[in-house]
Regions:
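Conserved functional micro-motifs across diverse proteins
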Residues: 1-48, 54-149
């Protein structure tokens, strides 16, 4: 669990749990390769990381989000390249819905790219985003790690 601070200073206690880390299919990799210029993903293995989130308590946070505060990591907690795609139904992230605000969980999807044979994605870290002060900061704090066992 972690404390989320919204854009207008709202505070809520959120729960997050790693659901899975799965390899992209050949069709998904082909689609992603079509979306990027200059073979940017060539030689990379693509994975999807799914994270379940729910609100435990606190202020209303609907229409806020914190998915940009999660970054792919390997089993040692080191950053892995993330891939951002907007509007792709096969891997979505969303803002907190009114239903989320009343306790319903949502599942976020993150895309990771690792060199073939390199540090395989094993989860995500939460770095607290732009919160100030930020106890979860990647450089000056202690990010929360959600890693597959």
């Amino acid at each position: 669990m972690y404390e989320f601070t919204g854009t207008d200073g709202q505070k809520a206690l959120l729960s997050a749990e790693l659901v899975d880390v799965t390899a992209a299919t050949a069709e998904q990799v082909a689609f992603l390769n079509e979306q990027f210029d200059k073979d940017e993903l060539k030689g990379f293995e693509i994975s999807f990381i799914h994270l379940s989130q729910s609100k435990v308590s606190g202020d209303p946070v609907e229409f806020n989000s914190d998915y940009t505060s999660f970054k792919p990591i390997d089993a040692q907690g080191q950053r892995v390249q993330d891939v951002t795609v907007i509007g792709w139904d096969e891997c979505t992230t969303e803002s907190f819905t009114p239903e989320f605000d009343t306790g319903e969980s949502i599942t976020q999807c993150f895309i990771a790219a690792a060199p073939a044979g390199g540090n395989a994605p094993a989860g995500v870290m939460y770095d607290g985003g732009y919160e100030d002060p930020n106890p979860y900061d990647y450089y000056d704090g202690k990010p929360l790690l959600f890693v597959a066992e």
